[in-house]
């Protein structure tokens, strides 16, 4: 009874007692028991390396610091007796008002971390061979390797463009090489790991050299002197060999740094007739390193050309050689480059084929088996649409027609790039089929039954072809055959096209041809121009072209139809003192776009950037800047598509101001080309081609507009894109019967498409029919 009562009293205190006991136990286990001496004593000869005994035993924590006599300096050998003591740097806070000294940092983090680039190629050339062999080396090597420098003895009058040429001031071979080494050490010694010296009479295979430099490491090749080994001249019994300079020499940075203090003594003491032998003797005497042709399983392969030996593509020596020597002339250099490039291309195709086989074999081990690998191997799988609106459309075509046309017509003939694309796909399909079935069968194409193609942004252009074939056997048999073939033209590597530099600071001249019937719209255009250009001080000017009809021109002195427009222009010039808005008056009954543009072009310099606008155009700063960026002199003309609001009786009603950008409120007018951005020089060049290429200039001047002129008679890129910053309200645009047939058709098409969407027009007709039936 008493025992149970005692246990009931002690039971709440049991966990506390167990916790305290466990804590003491863990504390004792975490203590390291060591012996510390009372004081240091000088080591005696013959003493063992055991720690000296002290007269106290103390418990020390693992992260505590021992007395200075017990810790030796890091890196010092055992038994040296040198003690290491920490040096405490006192902290002195800055005095009030005293400028603190800023830490000096390097410009690039790679310099501070000591990160160096991999390879520098130094081409030893001369003033006589720099314009010939030097240029050939630069064209075959400079585009593949980033850092190539040409070291010549004396600089000529004209240095080839695009080449880094350094004149050393010494034409003699040994002196030239000596100064070249000094230049590399002084200017690039701390920037690169490897230095490759090669004469300009040697072809260098850039891909192989890049792979070699990427494989080597300074950790395992500190002193590397790599090239074609050759014995010293004169039967010298000195151990070691030198590298033949004609086939290139690869030097490590460490070896070149050790050679620096010995360059002058080598220049004065070593006598040799060949610069490469002089370099080999200098390296051997200074560092004891001789030339080697192998390192870590990699062999320095070279190709020694015989005099007059022709270059034969497919020679197996081109697959492994890094350099070829000697090269006779630039033509010989380009022939070697073609042969080496073909060998490198075959090597790349073989690697791609091996990778495809490896992917196919590995995909069989996946959970989905062979279905896990996409076709073709290495190309992303087809995109899966998230909804029915994202389904990619297949376009049907035959050998003569396409059934998906840009203008919306149901059928259009294949022309230009589309026709060449279909012919190329058919030829490739037949070639692949014959490669698979030969020599058992010889297939010939009879006709294309069905053709489908679609563009997948993740893959490229996909094709599905139903081919009617005729199979021929070696015995002479023939029978018809139908096969379905799937092909893919994959997207290649995305590249940024080099284009001339453009800026938003270019001065822009806005041109506005204004007819008398459109004079009421001039006020809104002028105010929009003032808001977008004059108020912010933008570099933009405005020129008006006032189009008078013959009767209006006769009464211009008494009742000028453009008097309100001229008054508004004068008011703008008063509001903005630095602004000048000139106008030109033209009398014409049937204004031709090209004739009007000819008149405006003659009034401005050739380097003027034009923005051709219409009275409905609402200028904004964003559109002005896009016009400057998209119009490139000698390269590109920009024709934006504005957003045209639908008829207010068809579309939902909108308030004042610019129309709302939406599918039910308007559309981008593909038929209109009233806005254009181009340079005057490009327009003059296109007009010159029109005069030279056509005998019917007068007829074309009446039937063409500026857009058609650039499309047909200019070599520029014509950029046609939607412009969300150009918003125009609906206006019943009149189509003059005096226009040419093509321009009149485009005008009528623009008017009809601007009434409303198909759905809105159908609903309007349905409501009218319902009203008539009742």
From Swiss-Prot:
Requisite cofactors: Mn(2+); Co(2+)
Bound cofactor: record note: Highest activities are measured with Mn(2+). Can also utilize Co(2+).
One annotated Gene Ontology cellular component of this protein: Golgi apparatus
InterPro entries found in the cross-reference section: Chond_GalNAc (IPR008428), CS_glycosyltransferase (IPR051227)
Species this protein is from: Mus musculus
Lumenal side: 35-774
Binding site for a divalent metal cation: 616
Database matches in Pfam families: CHGN
Protein name listed in UniProt: Chondroitin sulfate synthase 2
